[in-house]
């Protein structure tokens, strides 16, 4: 079981939560990025550097993740592919994607893309709040408890 992070777009404060969690859980944490990352020294934390390019990091995460893994991403198509493989998916704001919710999120994403392509300014997401950080940490902990229960 591994936690995979779409690290190029992951906020640093979320990475810090993940570093601490990987140590506490003794769970492999892999940060996939097309740029160099500095991570704390740990036998549980590693980086995977990929070439720059559209969806290169996403494709590598999809290729390597397995059922039971956790993928941290705000990229909805990546989350959908991870879920199809049996992995869990969580965004940096603490929203856990499920097979039931991912279809709705994909539809909304496509709709927003259409609006932007037609010249309508849709704005971006709000900055990450303390509440978002707490929601992320709580959902990460919830996933970890599910993993422990499934192991017996």
From Swiss-Prot:
Q: What InterPro entries does the entry give?
A: UPF0178
Q: Which domain of life is it from?
A: Bacteria
Which is a Pfam family this sequence falls into? DUF188
Could you tell me which HAMAP family the record lists for this protein?
UPF0178
**Of which family is this protein a member?**
Belongs to the UPF0178 family.
Q: What PANTHER family does the record tag this protein with?
A: UPF0178 PROTEIN YAII
**Protein name in the entry:** UPF0178 protein YaiI
Q: Which organism's genome codes for this protein?
A: Shigella boydii serotype 18 (strain CDC 3083-94 / BS512)
Its taxonomic placement starts with:
Bacteria, Pseudomonadati, Pseudomonadota, Gammaproteobacteria, Enterobacterales
């Amino acid at each position: 079981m591994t936690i995979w992070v779409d690290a190029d777009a992951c906020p640093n404060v979320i990475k810090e939560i993940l570093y601490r969690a990987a140590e506490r859980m003794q769970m492999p944490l892999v940060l996939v990025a097309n740029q160099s990352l500095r991570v704390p020294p740990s036998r549980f934390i590693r980086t995977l550097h990929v070439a720059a390019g559209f969806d290169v990091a996403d494709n590598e995460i999809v290729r390597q993740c397995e059922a039971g893994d956790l993928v941290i991403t705000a990229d909805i198509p990546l989350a959908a592919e991870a879920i199809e493989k049996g992995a869990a998916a969580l965004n940096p704001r603490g929203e856990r994607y499920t097979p039931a919710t991912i279809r709705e999120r994909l539809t909304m994403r496509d709709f927003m893309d259409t609006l932007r392509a037609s010249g309508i300014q849709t704005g971006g997401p709000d900055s990450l709040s303390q509440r978002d950080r707490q929601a992320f940490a709580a959902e990460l902990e919830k996933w970890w408890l599910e993993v422990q229960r499934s192991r017996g």
